[in-house]
């Protein structure tokens, strides 16, 4: 009987491991207390600057200034259960785990802070498992756990199955029957990995 290869799991960072949305809202309200804001339960669409810009055009630039500022990514709180889940996943037999994250185009602070966040919260061994890319479709894997609902790039049919991680901006979306969702890190992520393993 042939030995099965390991399951490779790609895990997004912002909105999946690090609480980008809460950090953004808190930072925006702190910096611009007089401006209108979008409560988390009313967030719609992956890009916050687009929703803020629809409220008033100048708000798009203001909200972007929050996540482009030094310290923003470094100081994000972990998503509940994320760190323990990733450590357990990494210890699973025949399972390879990588953190697959897209840096901002305005990357001055973002890139270094993402590395430091991983080292501070998960340890140096996970720094070795960071993949920074603007196009996740070209990264080889079996599963991609990501809060972005529509991931496009050079590859029309990526090697991975996209598991949508529930976040405030996507919780209202109805997925087709062929798509799977992970509601939180308390949800059955182990079952998703094992079902993928069985299909390899």
Swiss-Prot record:
UniProt GO MF annotations: 5'-nucleotidase activity; identical protein binding; IMP 5'-nucleotidase activity; metal ion binding; phosphatase activity; pyrimidine nucleotide binding
Family to which this protein belongs: Belongs to the 5'(3')-deoxyribonucleotidase family.
Enzyme class: hydrolase
Residues reported to bind Mg(2+): 12, 14, 147
Cofactor(s) recorded in Swiss-Prot or TrEMBL: Mg(2+)
Annotated function: Dephosphorylates the 5' and 2'(3')-phosphates of deoxyribonucleotides, with a preference for dUMP and dTMP, intermediate activity towards dGMP, and low activity towards dCMP and dAMP.
Enzyme Commission number, as recorded: 3.1.3.-
Any Pfam family: NT5C
Entry annotated with the keyword Calcium: no
Positions of substrate binding: 20, 46, 67, 101, 136
Modified residues (Phosphothreonine): 102
GO cellular component: cytosol; mitochondrion; nucleus
Protein name from the UniProt record: 5'(3')-deoxyribonucleotidase, cytosolic type
